[in-house]
Amino acid sequence: MANAKEIRGQIKSVKNTRKITRAMEMVAASKMRRAQERMRAARPCAEKIREVLGHLAQAHPEYEHPLMQVRPVKKAGFLVVTTDRGLCGGLNVNVLRNVVQKMRELHEEGVESNLAVVGNKGLGFLRRHGAHLVADVNGLGDSPHLGDMIGPIRAMADAYAKGEVDVVYLVSSRFVNTMLQRATVEQLLPVEKPTASAEQRAELWDYIYEPEARPVLDRLMQRYVESVVYQAVIEHLACEQSARMVAMKSASDNAKRMVDDLQLAYNKARQAAITQEIAEISAGAARFDDCAQHFWKF
């Protein structure tokens, strides 16, 4: 058993660590609330773009945008969203596990994969494992802007439009609640064609376009893909802060339990030391009495 001095040093160290994890927990909670507000603010824009795009596609079925063309899959693209920093539980692990699993399934079918990565954690992992990276971006911070992440988006969209990849998957985390974040693999390209019933088509109305509808559809399709990825990045940021808050709370709770255990061990060590000192004093006193009695005999 360690002596009382060593245990006292361990208690001090764990208490200092707990102060740090508590501070990180509170910071993550504050950032999580702001990230959730950004996520909710971005959602109506993406939904409105999707609504207008669906209306345009149904009103002009004769025009098939290159990003909506379905082809036999010979090569796949992945746009992977991860974090720049760690200490967020298994958030990145779950995302990257999904990427590896999907790539393995495609490889068994003879399909190769290209990857574009958002976030330093995913970039480092995929580089170490020899993945074919075509674009990456990191250092987006806590308030990412669409312009900062446009590189990977354009790389995947252009590759699909040119026929260099035949399908693009978006891999990220979806925010369910503060305690639960779910890693997902969703098809980003080709964009699914909207469907309408006969009654809906009969009631379909149209906008007036100047000079024509095709440039509007082209531009809107590009904005739609960008909005989907931006929404995924914002949502992943909310997941990151939630996971970090939960991880730091767990670390703080574990530190408290460790301090309690160390305090108990310290009390036992101190009690043992005091008991030993009392025993030594008693033994010394008894020895002194024996010597004194022996002395007075003479």
From Swiss-Prot:
InterPro entries associated with the record: ATP_synth_F1_ATPase_gsu (IPR035968), ATP_synth_F1_gsu (IPR000131), ATP_synth_F1_gsu_CS (IPR023632)
Gene Ontology molecular function terms on file: ATP binding; proton-transporting ATP synthase activity, rotational mechanism
Key words of the record: ATP synthesis, Cell inner membrane, Cell membrane, CF(1), Hydrogen ion transport, Ion transport, Membrane, Transport
Location in the cell: Cell inner membrane
Membrane topology: Peripheral membrane protein
Main location: membrane
Single Gene Ontology BP annotation: proton motive force-driven plasma membrane ATP synthesis
GO cellular component: plasma membrane; proton-transporting ATP synthase complex
Subunit relationships: F-type ATPases have 2 components, CF(1) - the catalytic core - and CF(0) - the membrane proton channel. CF(1) has five subunits: alpha(3), beta(3), gamma(1), delta(1), epsilon(1). CF(0) has three main subunits: a, b and c.
Entry similarity comment: Belongs to the ATPase gamma chain family.
Annotated function: Produces ATP from ADP in the presence of a proton gradient across the membrane. The gamma chain is believed to be important in regulating ATPase activity and the flow of protons through the CF(0) complex.
Protein name, per record: ATP synthase gamma chain
